[in-house]
């Protein structure tokens, strides 16, 4: 069975529209947005694991690189996994506490590009919407592969720069250039964007991600995260994928 066979059955247009409708609440109602994203991410990881290994994810250890404010911790724990979150920002770690129940895993303050874990120490290593926020995204990817055990899964998902959501809260102004978009946002709102181009937001392309993933020899699948199954072929079209694949998922299985 191919890694995406189970997920393909769930990748419907209604799912895509449901997730798209949640995006507009990212700033105004983060519980609604991140709660929906966390639930969908757990289901995606479960589908990928079961299709690849034929076994359940229950009692596996998942390392979430860029765990953020706790939504994923609760969702993965509720699904029966042992959750460990890595987060470099202490503010995000403190924000996680009210959103996680008492048994929702643990958090480690560290950088995703220098993970403080032994080689092959986790079953699943996940990074959701983090690679575009670090200056060395493929060093992050290499670290994810290093800590994932042979036969496990590393799932790296990131926002493609030239896609419609590449500018994050700066909107479509990122098509004018990242620095210009950040300055425009600052003039309009009186403060720098949280996702500030050149410091906390970087231009990461689909082509670069696919090139890196293929170079590892561990690539099991690549697909657009939020698209219905019939649109997954966009990933194979150079140029077009940069604009129409809003978020690329790279699934790697180290041996």
From Swiss-Prot:
SUPFAM superfamilies: S-adenosyl-L-methionine-dependent methyltransferases. InterPro entries: Methyltransf_11, SAM-dependent_MTases_sf. Signal peptide: none annotated. GO terms for biological process: methylation. Its EC number is 2.1.1.-. It holds the Pfam family Methyltransf_11. GO terms for molecular function: S-adenosylmethionine-dependent methyltransferase activity. Keywords: Methyltransferase, Transferase. Belongs to the methyltransferase superfamily. PANTHER family: 2-METHOXY-6-POLYPRENYL-1,4-BENZOQUINOL METHYLASE, MITOCHONDRIAL, METHYLTRANSFERASE. This is Uncharacterized methyltransferase Mflv_0427. It comes from Mycolicibacterium gilvum (strain PYR-GCK) (Mycobacterium gilvum (strain PYR-GCK)).
